[in-house]
Amino acid sequence: MTEAYIVEAVRTPVGRRGGGLGAAHPADLGAHVLKELIARSGVDPAAVEDVVFGCLDTVGPQAGDIARTSWLAAGLPEEVPGVTVDRQCGSSQQALHFAAQGVLSGTQDLVVAGGTQNMTQIPIAFASRRAAEPLGLTQGPYAGSEGWRARYGDAPVNQFHGAQLIAEKWDISRRDMEEFALTSHHRAIRAIDEGRFARETVAYGDVTADEGPRRDTTLEKMAGLRPVVEGGTITAACSSQVSDGAAALLIASERAVAEHGLTPRARVHHLSVRGEDPIRMLSAPIPATAYALKKTGLTIDAIDLVEINEAFAPVVLAWLKETGADPERVNVNGGAIALGHPLGATGARLMTTLLHELERTGGRYGLQTMCEGGGQANVTIVERL
């Protein structure tokens, strides 16, 4: 059977909204990690057969197939194509899946996967809610569909509503969420201070480290925040941060490894994606993880490290309750609550961090998953080599 290997992975630091990456064109963010990826791997860029990038809200500077634009903005060969993927927050994890599947199928040998996003310039959901207003289209992507309304009625379709439903279903208190959020900040700060992210990041201008972690946050400060929705328990403190950034990985076949003298760092062990209730939206990592473990014959205890996106604290806390995973193996260097969530780049960022942490700790198996719009979740399991 053909194998798909991760041979290189790199990311920018994650910038806060309006921070050090806020003025950067998203294609330049993508180009930055692509140039670094090629330089670190030493591969001939003309040998790359496709560039698969994740990106959401593809309007303005993020329109026009930003995978292709990023590659060309990096000064790399024009004969290499690119394609942009939108599986909502899982877009660049899906980009990795498509890249690996191309290699596993035997139709491709060397593919780049990644993602880029500038949320400072293009706010979340701008494309679905405001971009079409000049055309007289004021409804979101669901309200105008007769089929959708017949099936789901007029129930709210948004992340905050989904997060609140999860908190209520799994009996997760506001205090639980705030304690989890504080731990995320503490872990991220420790990782930065210990240099754990040094190998996986490439500075962008003066931005040399992730800007999101808050050294001065406390449970008392979190307790003083107002809920996002009146009467709810979800606050900004237990939500992921609006962010900017990019990440990229190089996926290679056994033949490409031999031909280009590459060193495989991890083997793609499993790829899958599952769907669930689109109104609750954010709980799909639970059944998706169960599905992946059943398919592979692995147990959750066999997984050395997990990166599950911290879109909201209850997403991870509910997943922990259902899977029985050891919290000390999950998001060990903090997550999106502290580090930020640059939407279309986050999936690739998570895998980049997971790979480097497996190497640092000597772990064997790593699992990545994340909630996605529409009630979906990708799961990727890799084996460190």
Regions found by a protein language model. Give the residues of each.
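Conserved beta-ketoacyl condensing-enzyme motif
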Residues: G22-V111, T116-P134, T201-A209, I300-E322
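Conserved catalytic cysteine-centered active-site region
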Residues: A24, C55-D109, G153-Q159, D216-Q241, ...
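Active-site pocket-lining segment
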Residues: G162-Q164, F197-E200, V207, H269-A338
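Flexible glycine-/small-residue-enriched beta->alpha junction loops
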Residues: L110-L165
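Short, well-ordered amphipathic alpha-helical segments that serve as non-catalytic structural scaffolds
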Residues: P26-G42, I66-S70, A95-F98, Q159-I166, ...
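Active-site-proximal alpha-helical scaffold in enzymes
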Residues: D86-Q117, A167-R196, A248-R255, P342-T361, ...
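N-terminal extracellular/periplasmic Venus flytrap/periplasmic-binding protein-like
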Residues: R11-T12, A23-H32, R40, D176-E259, ...
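Condensing-enzyme catalytic core mediating Claisen C-C bond formation in acyl metabolism
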Residues: M1-A24, E36, Y142, E220-S283, ...
